[in-house]
Amino acid sequence: MTIKSLLSDIEREERNVHKAIKDSVKRNDLVTAKALAREIVSSRRTVKRLYENKAQVNSISMHLGESIATAVTVGNLSKSGEVMKLVNSLMKAPEIAVTMQAFSKEMTKTGVIEEFVSDAVDNALDSEDIEEEIEEEVDKVLTAIAGETAAELPEAVRKQKMNVPAQKAETLHGEDAIVEGVDAEEELEAIRYRLANVRS
């Protein structure tokens, strides 16, 4: 699957999630609404990475063209530190990591780049900082999609953690509410599954 088709699939799925969030807010199911908003934040970050990866692939192609031109005139391929840097960066991208591994091995064999060393270190931000940033983005998505309805909800309700199923069960009262909660969970899982397939 190409980067372009991946972006198209993610955008289409996000429109479906928008509707699911609005429906969840209407029935006061903030657990599902916030979980779905988190999925949108994750998808948008994936889209951002895909655009960055696309630009880096184009840059690699440019550097390879220069290396090949050098090989024609000098008789050997130039070892480009810039190409190595870009390849190492793309090796971290889950969307195209497998392709880049094979690509980099072939370039190493032909001498286009030196033996690559993939840096496994993530962003300088620690996980706690990233989590806080994601929570802020989730609240923004909820407000943007659900509008005043979500904005008027108590702060404590909007900030509650969404990843504890037992917590959701405790907030539901009566048999009908429990059945509705199960349906919402199934809907959420189905959407998560589709989003995961798009991003993988």
From Swiss-Prot:
Disulfide linkages recorded for this protein, renumbered to the chain, are: none
| Signal peptide range | none
* One GO-annotated biological process of the protein: protein transport
Q: Which Pfam families match?
A: Snf7
Q: Which Gene3D superfamilies match?
A: 6.10.140.1230
Name the GO cellular-component terms: ESCRT III complex
Q: How does it assemble?
A: Component of the endosomal sorting required for transport complex III (ESCRT-III), composed at least of VPS2, VPS20, VPS24 and VPS32.
What is known about what this protein does?
A: Component of the ESCRT-III complex, which is required for multivesicular bodies (MVBs) formation and sorting of endosomal cargo proteins into MVBs. The ESCRT-III complex is probably involved in the concentration of MVB cargo.
By sequence similarity, the record places it as follows: Belongs to the SNF7 family.
What is this protein's record name? Putative vacuolar protein sorting-associated protein 24 homolog 2
What's the source species for this entry? Answer: Arabidopsis thaliana (Mouse-ear cress)
